[in-house]
Amino acid sequence: GKMYIVNMINNFKGILVQEYDPEKECLVGEAKNVFLGTGRGYTEGPHIYHIGEYYYLLMAEGGTGYEHMVTMARSRSIWGPYEEDPGNPVLTSDVDNPEKLQKCGHADLVCTQNGEWYMVHLCGRPPKGSRQCVLGRETAIQKMVWNEEGWLRLACGGRFGQWETEESTGIQEYLFPEEEGKDYGKEDFDLEIADSAGNNETAKNADIAETLSKT
């Protein structure tokens, strides 16, 4: 199959698609603006998934604040034309309920070995009575299902991100092998470094390297 690069055009002017040649390690052919956005503004963070007979375009829109959202469109060709999901936004936030996840948007999809679909996305959790997300941008996950019309929907219904989601069934935990660590010593560091005054810092850095090797 072919490979493509998909990205936002500067200043949110659309979604650009161009073919990528993995052997030459470069872009080839003409770049095309395949989608201008849904009109909600700040269209960015695009992903394209070839699922069944459609190419699904997943986007972040609305900005990264409380109007953040996930929208979708689809086409039978990667080059478009793309039709907007009539149920957009697929995911957003209930800004009138501060106890819920806020700023939900900028998502990605994963399908498990059992064919279950999940969406990972950015969000914020402001303390009750505040609109300041002191932990910054966090990551959440939602279980998804496909409706009869072939559009992706939250398994819990609606379009608001939930604190908890249904776990995947029958998936075994994957344990990553533990690689043997390396002990770093003086010989691993370039100690010939001069300070801002031009003085050689060899002795000082040697002491630092010696300390690191003992930790």
Where do the language-model regions lie?
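Carbohydrate-active catalytic/glycan-binding domains of CAZyme proteins
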Residues: G1-T215
